[in-house]
């Protein structure tokens, strides 16, 4: 009985040895195995067993030349030849590698299968054992993350389209107690591309919805801002002196109301003042302080507290001007940021003191002029999606290609 058990163990070992060596020299692996391809060029295809036993998976099975030779001599595949001195092996010249044509690639693709649902700690041997009675599998590629962790899915190449189809169409397949997702490899990539397109569309829709929500919030904030400023606009007009400036207005109302913004340029005949509080109160106080005759540089002026739609439109324009001035200030700040003492632009800026904020019809604190400079914007280029199967990622292993 013990002898029968030993014989069974040896037969199982020999089968594994044959399977592993025939995989190394097989149609799928050999064209991709750079190291082995270099070896077979050295001696008419012969590779010393001394080299072969350095391949990790074969090494774990045996390093005994006699065991390897005995196993190959019993193989029904008749793929391998053994040298007369029994120290070298090679793929039989009578069974040349298939030419890698588009037709051949398409054939391999049609018998390639995607399987998902394995535990992430599953070993290749576990998966090979599970596939043993599912048809002849020529290659197993364990799909991994960038950090080499197993993703729980594989690509398996069957020996024929028929066996691959039979496997895919077998219902209710499980690995242990886990249901498996099984698809042809081509169908898997089609499904993934459809999912990517769907995700892209959903992302665009979410972005659009978020943008609309932001726009709505901005509009609500703008309306709230407008409501807070209702009654705070005072328009002035008349045959104003050409030298009339914002400082004149600040001086005129300095003790009667806090000015937040002046919409006016030197030489214009009208403008608008935005007060922090109600404009009528500031106007009444200023008139009272000037005996009812409120002038600018000894020129008669018509003063009008804006109301209704005219007021709202004027407020919107002022808010836009404020934002434009703020953006230009931020842009100029970025350009000057980090300038050294030797920089001419920095020296010029430091000589003038602080930067003044004034563009067309806009003003914060002074009447000095400044250049109008816009900020450049970077444009992101969208990545193009493809419906085609991406180039295969070669898994680096002990002998070059594949996981098997």
Curated annotation (Swiss-Prot):
Give all residue intervals belonging to the RRM domain: 111-187
Q: What is this protein called?
A: Lupus La protein homolog
Gene symbol here is SSB
Q: Where is the composition biased (Low complexity)?
A: 343-354
- N6-acetyllysine: residues bearing it: 116, 128, 328, 341, 360
What does the annotation say about its assembly with partners? Interacts with DDX15. May interact with RUFY1.
- Keyword annotations: Acetylation, Nucleus, Phosphoprotein, RNA-binding
Residues with Phosphothreonine modification: 120, 362
């Amino acid at each position: 009985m013990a002898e029968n058990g030993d014989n069974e163990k040896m037969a199982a070992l020999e089968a594994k040895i044959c399977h592993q060596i025939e995989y190394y020299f097989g149609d799928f692996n050999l064209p991709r195995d750079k190291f082995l391809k270099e070896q077979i060029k050295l001696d008419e295809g012969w590779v010393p067993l001394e080299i072969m036993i350095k391949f990790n998976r074969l090494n774990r099975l045996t390093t005994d030349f006699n065991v390897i030779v005995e196993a190959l001599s019993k193989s029904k595949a008749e793929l391998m030849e053994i040298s007369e001195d029994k120290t070298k092996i090679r793929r039989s010249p009578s069974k040349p590698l298939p030419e890698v044509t588009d037709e051949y690639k398409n054939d391999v693709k049609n018998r390639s299968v995607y399987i998902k649902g394995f535990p992430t700690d599953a070993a290749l041997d576990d998966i090979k054992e599970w596939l043993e009675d599912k048809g002849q599998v020529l290659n197993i590629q364990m799909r991994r993350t960038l950090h080499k962790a197993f993703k729980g899915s594989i690509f398996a190449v069957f020996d024929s389209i028929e066996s691959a189809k039979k496997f895919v169409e077998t219902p209710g397949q499980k690995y242990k107690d886990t249901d498996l997702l099984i698809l042809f490899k081509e169908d898997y990539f089609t499904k993934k591309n459809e999912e990517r397109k769907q995700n892209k569309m959903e992302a665009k829709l979410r972005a659009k919805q978020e943008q609309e929500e932001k726009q709505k919030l901005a509009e609500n904030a703008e309306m709230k801002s407008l409501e807070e400023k209702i009654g705070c606009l005072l328009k002035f007009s008349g045959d104003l002196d050409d030298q009339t400036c914002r400082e004149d207005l600040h001086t005129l109302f300095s003790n009667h109301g806090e000015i937040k913004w002046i919409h006016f340029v030197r030489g214009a005949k009208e403008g608008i003042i935005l007060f922090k509080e109600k404009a009528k109160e500031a106007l009444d106080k200023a008139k009272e302080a000037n005996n009812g005759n409120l002038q600018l540089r000894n020129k008669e002026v018509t003063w009008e507290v804006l109301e209704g739609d005219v007021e709202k439109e004027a407020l919107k324009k002022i808010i836009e001007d404020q934002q434009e001035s703020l953006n230009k200030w931020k842009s100029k700040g970025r350009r000057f940021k980090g300038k050294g003492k030797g920089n001419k632009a920095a020296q010029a800026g430091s000589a003038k003191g602080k930067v003044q904020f004034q563009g067309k019809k806009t003003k914060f604190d002074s009447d000095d002029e400044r250049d109008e400079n816009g900020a450049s914007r970077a444009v992101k280029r969208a990545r193009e999606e493809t419906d085609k199967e991406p180039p295969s990622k070669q898994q680096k292993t002990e002998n070059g290609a594949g996981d098997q």
